[in-house]
Amino acid sequence: MVQQQTILNVADNSGAKKLMVIRVLGGSRKRFGKIGDIVVASVKEAIPGGNVKKGDIVKAVIVRTRKETRRDDGSYIKFDDNAGVVINNNNEPRATRIFGPVARELRARNFMKILSLAIEVI
């Protein structure tokens, strides 16, 4: 589960390294975000020469969470970190590579470009 002030690792090569969640999008009272949810975040760490700079406000989609997620078949999936991918206003990734595994639940949310760039889909 991801909420306001949560620090996310960035799982792409957009130039950002850490994001801090400002808001979970999707309703006025939506407090927690899960895999596939879109958040508004601030870049807290960035590498020099990247597409995004420290202090930028970006949109990101959550691709990994430490909190387990229940699947339709009754199994649970959880990851070692909370991670997101920086996206543009068309919900497409701003980066050209995705690092680490991503969850299969992104397919139901129509993030096909992220799934195709990912090395491993779990």
Swiss-Prot record:
InterPro entries: Ribosomal_uL14, Ribosomal_uL14_bac-type, Ribosomal_uL14_CS, Ribosomal_uL14_sf. CDD domains: Ribosomal_uL14 (cd00337). One of its GO terms (molecular function) is large ribosomal subunit rRNA binding. GO terms for cellular component: cytosolic large ribosomal subunit. One of its GO terms (biological process) is translation. SMART domains: Ribosomal_L14. Disulfide bonds: none annotated. Keywords: Ribonucleoprotein, Ribosomal protein, RNA-binding, rRNA-binding. The keyword Ubl conjugation does not apply. It comes from the Bacteria. The keyword Oxidoreductase does not apply. NCBIfam families: rplN_bact. Binds to 23S rRNA. Forms part of two intersubunit bridges in the 70S ribosome. Belongs to the universal ribosomal protein uL14 family. PANTHER family: 50S/60S RIBOSOMAL PROTEIN L14/L23, LARGE RIBOSOMAL SUBUNIT PROTEIN UL14M. Part of the 50S ribosomal subunit. Forms a cluster with proteins L3 and L19. In the 70S ribosome, L14 and L19 interact and together make contacts with the 16S rRNA in bridges B5 and B8. This is Large ribosomal subunit protein uL14.
